UniProtKB/Swiss-Prot annotation:
Pfam families, alphabetized: EFG_C (PF00679), EFG_III (PF14492), EFG_IV (PF03764), GTP_EFTU (PF00009), GTP_EFTU_D2 (PF03144)
Gene name as annotated: fusA
Protein name: Elongation factor G
InterPro entries, A to Z: EFG_II, EFG_III, EFG_III/V, EFG_IV, EFG_V, EFG_V-like, EFTu-like_2, G_TR_CS
Organism in which the protein naturally occurs: Koribacter versatilis (strain Ellin345)
Lineage: Bacteria, Pseudomonadati, Acidobacteriota, Terriglobia, Terriglobales
Residue ranges occupied by any tr-type G domain in the UniProt entry: 8-283
One GO term describing the cellular component: cytoplasm
Amino acid sequence: MARQVPLERCRNIGIMAHIDAGKTTTTERVLFYTGRTHRIGEVHEGTATMDWMAQEQERGITITSAATTCTWRDERINIIDTPGHVDFTAEVERSLRVLDGAVAVFDAVHGVEPQSETVWRQADKYSVPRICFINKIDKMGADFEHAIDTIRKRLNAKPVAIQYPIGLEDKFKGVIDLFKMKALVWHDEAMGSQYDVEEIPAELLKKAQAFHNLMVETIAECDDELMAKYIEGEEMTAAELQAGLRRATIAMKVFPVTVGTAFKNKGVQTLLDAVVDYLPSPLDIPPVTGKNPDTGLEEQRSADDKQPFAALAFKIMTDPFVGQLTFIRVYSGQLKTGDSVYNSSKGRTERIGRLLKMHANKREEIGEIMAGDICAVVGLKTITTGDTISDEKHPLVLESIEFPTPVISVAVEPKTKSDQEKMGVALNKLAQEDPTFRVSTDPDSGQTIIAGMGELHLEILVDRMMREFHVQANVGKPQVAYRETIRKEAQAEGKYIRQTGGSGQYGHCKIRVGPNEPGKGYEFINDIVGGTIPKEFIKPIDQGIKEALEGGVLAGYEMVDVKVTLYDGSYHDVDSNEMAFKIAGSMAFKEAARKASPVLLEPVMSVEVVVPEEYMGVIIGDLNSRRGRIEGLEHRAGSQVVKAMVPLAEMFGYVNSMRSNTQGRATFSMHFAHYEEAPRSVAEEIVAKVQGKPAAR
């Protein structure tokens, strides 16, 4: 089948921002103006097309990333609307991994907000070119120039305004196109679908000229040819400048800025024009690199239908009508319904049942997908998020998606025996969909423990378990996910010998342990020379150490950032086997870790409180009493912003305390920053609690 839309006319984009900046409202307008929907859905009414989950409609927030496809100026745009709440950071992470470009939406009053910084850093990590949309320019206190300034200062980015607003707050009626130097004015009665091109109002001419000159200079700085013309004082055409801006945007040297109000239907078409004009097609991005699992060598795949098939699974979802849906991004080649594909991450071949184009939670069946497409697949049984599927004759494993580890957990107990069976199925399905959701069993109490990124995250997962899977359960109080690590180097040996008639068991190893760089995780180094331990027993030792890491040595928490070197040992010709060396590895590690000054690590959150000036003292005092470190204060839109680092354990119930301290006039946001060593008194209390002893005073 021939390609319906040439690859250079395709865009894969995400819409990302801080919670409440207006991402979903912007997406709803995009769908309306591109003819994808015939009625505008509203978040506050619970009718937004992209927020289709019951929990999203009730809370007025986006929880999952919903995918859709629309057409603008004969260009196909695949859009993923991502959540802005920090608890759903995994949804943003996995979407950005497979997108070619993004629209970052900012609130015109606040500019850059805490979660805007988080998603911006995530986009930097995956080198995703972006354009910025300053939304809510009609809101009281809107300030276009301040919003741009926050992008420059707080994100350390180079924004370039390509539009300037005509009027602010309730006087906003259109934008100035800084390339053509014309005013675009919208009509309220036409639902924003039409605008007139007029001359720039006289009172704004000077400001528009200054912004035009700044734009020309910024674009010229990124392009040698244009710079030469600029220095010579030659006139540059709008087409030349736009081509230069496209190159600079794709190279992430600059970020074009547009402006409007999605809710009042102004500025959305010009945003769509910018998506088509400046964001990359799959042909504009570098080829993807992966490893051939057979040879271990790196290989590249470019966006070409004729190359071998390669795609990345970035999301798994359970659909009540068709079962498990796997969302994939195709990087090269093509695939038809009924074809067999090779899961190169797992080494298994599977058959494609159906291929679906998704529009939020509605499905459209298609027969074939090609390079650059994003779609859903039915029929893949063993796949997990981050797996690569490829052509079996040309296997390739692409770089997977990294997800943050959960920082908060609760115990869940089914109410009846039938709930217990249903709960197991429900939790497995939810864990398969969400890589930041973990399910485990407490070895002492036998309780089921679920862990996630925050209280809201767990609340929504429990709500889904009850509604979608009809499970009734009691939920415990939130608990903090502590970690353990070591501070010194130490050595130990593990010797496991068992003699039980016939062949026995013999495993013996000597190891050195030491701290690894924070965030580097576990590292195993094999320094065995001369065959003192045969090659086939090295992996079981590594496995035994990994299992010992899971239970720590202080309070049973996972141990992280540890380097282990295996340097000596011995074996028995008859009695040695894999199990004996696995046990020996575990014994050696536990002994070495106890000698290596083990410490408890606690998750620390980056907290930002926006508060009226008169309550600032009480907020700072409260954060200090929670073991918080004040990192900075700044003035923003008539309020003070207090930034602090606070241990997660001290933040439970903070929202109620903050509201009562400020008569409900403050707001706060927090996201996970890092793990750091817990103070001795706190660590002793936690260890004593786990071991069931009173803490030493």
